[in-house]
A protein has these predicted regions:
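Residues that scaffold the ATP/ADP-binding catalytic core of kinase and kinase-like folds
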Residues: 52, 97-100, 208, 220
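Amphipathic alpha-helical segments enriched in hydrophobic/aromatic residues interleaved with Lys/Arg
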Residues: 102-162
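Ligand-binding loop in jelly-roll beta-barrel domains
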Residues: 71-95
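Generic protein-terminus/edge-of-domain signal
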Residues: 1-65, 72, 80, 103-105, ...
């Protein structure tokens, strides 16, 4: 039986924001980004796409929970013409036993959890939190404060599936290189700059990136 994940004693997370992505909207390209002072979790209520977090790439579908560790680069893209339907929650003060502050999971356990038998609970909790966060009344704030810890613990304790299996090292590195370029696109980057940031030699970096993407980092930029 897997070890249960619990909060550090006396440490309860707080909701910073709740947003709902409407499926009817046309799919848009979002900038790769990270959050240095808080974390996020998303519930996919409709659609399919891809989630990349910390360089690890996962196909995602309805009923998935997307976990994010504070400080990691991440992005969600739809595989259809329309936006993937998600409920997104920004969370501060997350402290789970055995994990660094702001971390939902260890990378080797993957960043996606299928809701499976808990899908009805996940849907209901996510919708309730979003709706009450939108109301912004004192009693709604209290409801959110009570429901959010339940959603977080339920999500963190869901078992990973086969998508959490080891991913090719070079694929993870190529994703991290691409994400680094994406967050520094306004700068005049050189291979040496990227190599220094990734702790890799420029030659090795360029070789891996071309092997995975079919183009050099310079052409990608």
């Amino acid at each position: 039986m897997a070890e249960e994940i619990r909060f550090v004693s006396g440490q309860m997370p707080s909701l910073l924001y709740a947003t709902k992505q409407i499926v009817a909207a046309s799919a848009i390209t979002r900038a790769i980004h990270r959050h240095e002072r808080f974390t996020e979790m998303l519930y996919v209520y409709q659609g399919a796409g891809q989630y990349i977090a910390g360089g690890y790439s996962y196909p995602i579908r309805t009923g998935d929970i997307l976990l994010y560790n504070q400080g990691d680069l991440h992005e969600v893209t739809s595989s259809l013409q329309h936006e993937i339907g998600t409920l997104c929650f920004g969370i501060s003060g997350l402290q789970l036993c055995g994990l660094p502050e702001g971390h939902f999971t260890k990378a080797e356990n993957g960043f996606v959890r299928p809701a499976m038998d808990e899908i009805d609970h996940m849907q209901s909790l996510s919708e309730l939190i979003y709706e009450h966060a939108e109301r912004r009344t004192s009693y709604s704030d209290e409801i959110v404060a009570q429901l959010l810890p339940a959603l977080v613990l339920l999500s963190a304790n869901l078992p990973p599936d086969a998508r959490a299996a080891d991913q090719p090292h070079n694929l993870v590195l190529a994703n991290r290189i691409r994400q680094y370029i994406g967050t520094h696109f306004t700068e005049q980057l050189t291979l040496e700059d990227i190599g220094e940031a990734m702790s890799m030699s420029p030659y090795h970096l360029a070789h891996i990136f071309k092997e995975i993407t079919g183009m050099s980092p310079i052409h990608y930029m």
